[in-house]
Amino acid sequence: MKKFFLYLIAFALPPMVSLAQERQIKEKGKTFFKPHPFLQLQGGAAHTLGEATFMDLISPAAALNLGYQFTPVFGMRLGASGWQGKGGWVAPAQLYEFQFVQGNLDLLFDLGALFGGFKPKRAISPYLFAGGGYAYGFENGATAINTNDYDLEYLWMEKRGFLGGRVGLGMSVRISDAVAIILEGGATILDDHFNSKRANNPDWQFN
């Protein structure tokens, strides 16, 4: 569990821009929440948990999310993400890459609004998200590594889909009523076949 949260922190560095329509209604000294759609653009880094050093398994990542904020606390988003995953083989030591794209549906919970109420001018709003996704892998570099005749039971040769669960934390920094910069770290828990190696436990992709 400690390692999980360390990865979340490590990949919460690249910023994400969030654009939203007007989210408040003003009336003579009162401000009311207005449900609204939003758009999120993200770029950063990812890490595929595997048998290699941490830095060797870092790869680029990008995401696009479209969502809707139903209440000050609760929202949903539909997104597409992915780019590249990496894996490592121990003997002889080798690295390989594979490409993937992922669709995801997340539930969002604004912790600032949950515990402090709706405040449209709040500078920093932490949030939690959880959901599910489907990753579609292709161009698997594991097909070309030297395994000394060891049979990779979970090797996928061309293309393959993987169901997964998602969870993560984020922080929204308000720039204006319509724009925010977001720092987010998350993990996707995928089928054991994702990195082509059998480990009898789920594969993890952090970004």
Tell where the protein language model's regions lie, with residue ranges:
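Short glycine/proline- and aromatic-enriched beta-strand/turn motifs that initiate or cap beta-hairpins
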Residues: 21-67, 139
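Extracellular loop and loop/strand-boundary signature of outer-membrane beta-barrel proteins
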Residues: 26-27, 49-52, 89-96, 148-157, ...
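Residues that define the transmembrane beta-barrel architecture of outer-membrane proteins
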Residues: 35, 56-62, 99-103, 124, ...
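Predominantly the C-terminal beta-signal and adjacent terminal strand-loop region
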Residues: 89-93, 98-100, 176-207
